[in-house]
Every structure is written in structure tokens, then in C-alpha cells.
Amino acid sequence: MQAFTQHEGLVALLDRENVDTDLIIPKQFLKSIKRAGFGPNLFDELRYLDHGEPGMDNSKRPLNSDFVLNQPRYQGASVLLARKNFGCGSSREHAPWALTQYGFRAIIAPSYADIFFNNSFKNGLLPIVLGELEVARLFDEVKAFPGFKLNIDLERQVVIAPDGRELGFDIEPFRKYCLLNGLDDIGLTLRQADKIRAFEAERLARHPWLESRPVA
């Protein structure tokens, strides 16, 4: 998992509440459990004018020019500004997969659905909670100033606006540690590899029959 320490990125906005996981990545794209290939279908029903299905050549599909991610000013955005209850609906880890594979490193919103919030941390996506008034001001600024960027300093737990103001945010220490060090669940487990091997060797010495093999 890619570590997250500090990130400055162009901000794209999604000005709607209760964005559910089916809107983030529609159900027909959940047939694969590989963590690859979901970025082109992020917000599929909003980005394209036709109905998307797995295997379609997205480069030939008609784009919805009104959708923010299709507008030139938001190309290359890596910070998503959203409204409250982002990521609600069914549990699907494909949602943060699609967001990160598109290129987003962080989301800023007043609130999130719990499961999406937890899944985001496990996949290197930083979900930042700011107050509704702060988020509303950021929305106004993004709309008013093309090329609007934010600097996110995870170590200091602040979002820094272009005018220099700092917006603090909370994060659980363990989640912060994992993001700073690029550790997902597998990475955390591998840090204990020596202890795991020592335990397996001791168990085998005490209970050798547990590793017995059937006679051919």
C-alpha cells in the first residue's frame, strides 16, 4: 500500500449528498476481486451517457460533458470534495479501489458511511472529516478558482488552503500510523513474520503429528 505523508492535489467536487457505493462503482463491475481495472468505471453512471458493462471499451463510450470528472479544469484531480454521508449503501471494497485507481488520494466530506470509512483506510485512501461550514466554503472556493489545490499534511493533521489557512482534522492514531507507513492488513502481518515462523517451529516441535502427511 502506498504511504501517505503529505499530498498536494487538485480538488474536484461532487456536489450531492448521500453518494452511495453503487454510484461510486456500479454492481455490474463487482465480478472481479482483483484490485485492478476499476478506475475507468468510477462513477460510471455519471461519467458516461450509456449503460456500462464489464469488458466495454470505455474510450469509445459517449461522455457526459456535464459531469465534473469529464471537465478539463478537473483533469488530474487527486482530492475529492464531497457532501455528507459519502459512501453509504452496500459494503463493497471495490469503492475505495475505484477511487484510488482513478487517482484520488483523499476525500474531504462532513461525514461518511462507517463501512466505506473503514475500507478507505485499509486501501490507502484518506477520508477527512471537516465541518459542514468548512466544506461549504471549500466548495465555493473550488467553483470560483479553477486549478484550486489543497495541501494535506497527515503528520500534522491539517488541510492547508491556498490562502494559508489550516483546517485541522482528527484521525485515530493506529490508522494514522498505518497510512504514514503504507501498511495494510497484510503489511502489518508481515511485520510479525519472524514471530509467526518462531511460533510455527515451536508448535511443530511440541505437536509434530499436526503436520503429519498421509501415507501414499
UniProtKB/Swiss-Prot annotation:
SUPFAM superfamilies: LeuD/IlvD-like (SSF52016). It holds the Pfam family Aconitase_C. GO terms for molecular function: 3-isopropylmalate dehydratase activity. Gene3D superfamilies: Aconitase, domain 4 (3.20.19.10). Keywords: Amino-acid biosynthesis, Branched-chain amino acid biosynthesis, Leucine biosynthesis, Lyase. GO terms for biological process: L-leucine biosynthetic process. Heterodimer of LeuC and LeuD. Catalyzes the isomerization between 2-isopropylmalate and 3-isopropylmalate, via the formation of 2-isopropylmaleate. Belongs to the LeuD family. LeuD type 1 subfamily. This is 3-isopropylmalate dehydratase small subunit 2. The gene is leuD2.
